[in-house]
């Protein structure tokens, strides 16, 4: 995944020092795009090990419309723990906006169900968009959406997805986001009778936290290995019917994990 290494190198060489909400400090660039051909392998970083279980369970949690960390904790995933309240609640974060966006007239809009039907009925639509950025709810969220809007595009029997991410923690968060949205694209392609095309990742403020710089330099010394293959149970035809057991990552041979602290 040379695209990701190029981003690390750009930030380390051209990044601007910025203050941030967490008080940690960052090196930051503004505006960056990476493209991943999903037919060329599943874009899971090989220059450090990523936890597939956490990536898959978080995505399934989003798709359930859940905003409490109980499901994640029950499945051994702790990535949202720092932001949850004493009851495990996060406020109206991703799952709520994806599955039950509150309309002004009192309706609840299921953006994911709608997008699947739109892709089936009108694949050439330029309105195949899901947004998690709801200005009316942002102040009630434990953490406002970083990956905040994505759009699908159908051409030649293939489904592509472009994600806009306003804030990108490049060392810890972005590798998760790449794998998560690549997987979501594959899942929606399967249930709409399409093949996976590209995942395009567009970043706004792309940053390395000051306590991740040495880890990024270490990662850049490692040579990328062949990408793995993601195999999805072809029997699943409902985007809300997927379970963790329906996904098998074959041929994943990464370099060892690199530890880094999350900026809260």
Curated annotation (Swiss-Prot):
Sorted UniProt keywords: Cytoplasm, Methyltransferase, Nucleotide biosynthesis, Transferase
Top-level taxon of origin: Bacteria
Catalytic activity: dUMP + (6R)-5,10-methylene-5,6,7,8-tetrahydrofolate = 7,8-dihydrofolate + dTMP
Amino-acid positions noted as binding (6R)-5,10-methylene-5,6,7,8-tetrahydrofolate in the UniProt annotation, renumbered to this chain: 169, 263
CDD domains in alphabetical order: TS_Pyrimidine_HMase (cd00351)
Localisation per UniProt entry: Cytoplasm
Gene Ontology CC terms, in alphabetical order: cytosol
Gene3D superfamilies: Thymidylate synthase/dCMP hydroxymethylase domain
GO biological process: dTMP biosynthetic process; dTTP biosynthetic process; methylation
EC number, as in UniProt: 2.1.1.45
Stored PROSITE patterns: THYMIDYLATE_SYNTHASE
List of catalytic residues: 146
Residues reported to bind dUMP: 21, 126-127, 166-169, 177, 207-209
GO molecular function terms attached to this record: thymidylate synthase activity
InterPro entries: Thymidate_synth/dCMP_Mease, Thymidate_synth/dCMP_Mease_dom, Thymidate_synth/dCMP_Mease_sf, Thymidylate_synthase, Thymidylate_synthase_AS
Pathway: Pyrimidine metabolism; dTTP biosynthesis
Function of the protein: Catalyzes the reductive methylation of 2'-deoxyuridine-5'-monophosphate (dUMP) to 2'-deoxythymidine-5'-monophosphate (dTMP) while utilizing 5,10-methylenetetrahydrofolate (mTHF) as the methyl donor and reductant in the reaction, yielding dihydrofolate (DHF) as a by-product. This enzymatic reaction provides an intracellular de novo source of dTMP, an essential precursor for DNA biosynthesis.
Subunit structure: Homodimer.
Family that this chain belongs to: Belongs to the thymidylate synthase family. Bacterial-type ThyA subfamily.
Name of protein: Thymidylate synthase
Organism of origin: Rhodopseudomonas palustris (strain BisB5)
